Amino acid sequence: MGTKYKFLNPSGIYFISFAVVDWIDVFTRNKYKDIIVESLRYCFEKKGMVLFAWCIMTSHVHLIFGVKGNIKHSDLIRDFKKFTSKAIINAIIHNTQESRKEWMLEKFVKARTNKTNISGYQFWQHDNLPIEVFTPSVIACSKIL
């Protein structure tokens, strides 16, 4: 198994990018962006995320982050993506003013077709493409949160 896109350094600081399936522009609505922001805040305050920079684009998210404590980078991102996926899809389902609701939900169902490990909807693409960017001592002075 290759190591090109893995979190190899437990104390490393990584740039990752993860996108909505089919690059759907979900984050044009503040309601859905707020779920990402609140989830990042929770990960920072409760789960050991050290967040240096983040950017929410219309269809994807960029993070520069590390971890403290016993949590692994991959476990943190797995949990973040799992929670935000469910929360955003639930928000879409219950948003009576979402004009793209049926179209988006259909895309999320189609994205999980033929994938045995996913039931319901697939919101995020599977890859994160982590790239270790700096050592902790280099970036410590520019921490955002």
What are these regions (language model features)?
Residues 1-145:
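Short catalytic/metal-binding and nucleic-acid-binding patches
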